[in-house]
């Protein structure tokens, strides 16, 4: 009987950030730009984007790379940002005082971000592979 789970050959390289104080759609705007990129490219993109969501996402990518290095002995240059999910978290509800004793409701959304990285040699992308050279990255077709 076949398993219904993940079909990847090795264990997952995961990093999870929970209850990040930003809305999920603002985090997805940034996440969609780095999905499928290499570790170095993802960090360069995040450094140049002018959004506040870039900082916690870059911290999470650093954490995933540190997990891969510490737990599996993989090199950071060989990592690829694979599956990335942004889910909505709890909503903090607050009240802003208004005139004449009224209260104005404020909702402060949170989100959960999950990054699953994979090694470039194990990636399932048949079109492109990336090789590390002395002068950065060289794209080649398989």
Swiss-Prot record:
Location in or out of the cell: Plastid, Chloroplast
Task: Using the UniProt record, give the first listed, main subcellular location.
Answer: plastid
Organism superkingdom: Eukaryota
Q: Name one Pfam family in it.
A: Ribosomal_L22
Which GO terms of the cellular component aspect does the record hold? chloroplast; large ribosomal subunit
- Please give the biological process terms from Gene Ontology that the record holds: translation
MF terms in GO: rRNA binding; structural constituent of ribosome
Which UniProt keywords are given for this protein, alphabetically ordered?
Chloroplast, Plastid, Ribonucleoprotein, Ribosomal protein, RNA-binding, rRNA-binding
Q: Which NCBIfam families match?
A: rplV_bact (TIGR01044)
Subunit organization:
Part of the 50S ribosomal subunit.
Query: What the protein does?
Result: This protein binds specifically to 23S rRNA.
User: Its family?
Assistant: Belongs to the universal ribosomal protein uL22 family.
Q: What is this protein called?
A: Large ribosomal subunit protein uL22c
Q: What is the lineage of its organism?
A: Eukaryota, Viridiplantae, Streptophyta, Embryophyta, Tracheophyta
What gene does this protein come from?
Answer: rpl22
């Amino acid at each position: 009987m076949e398993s219904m789970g993940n079909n990847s050959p090795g264990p997952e390289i995961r990093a999870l950030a929970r209850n990040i104080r930003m809305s999920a759609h603002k985090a997805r705007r940034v996440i969609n730009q780095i999905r499928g990129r290499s570790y170095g490219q993802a960090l360069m993109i995040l450094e140049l984007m002018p959004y506040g969501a870039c900082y916690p996402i870059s911290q999470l990518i650093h954490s995933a790379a540190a997990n891969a290095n510490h737990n599996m002995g993989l090199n950071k240059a060989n990592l690829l940002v694979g599956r990335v999910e942004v889910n909505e978290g709890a909503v903090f509800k607050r009240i802003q005082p208004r005139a004449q004793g009224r209260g104005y409701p404020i909702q402060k959304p949170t989100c959960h971000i999950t990054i699953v990285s994979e090694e470039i040699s194990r990636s399932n992308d048949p079109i492109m592979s990336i090789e590390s050279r002395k002068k950065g990255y060289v794209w080649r077709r398989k």
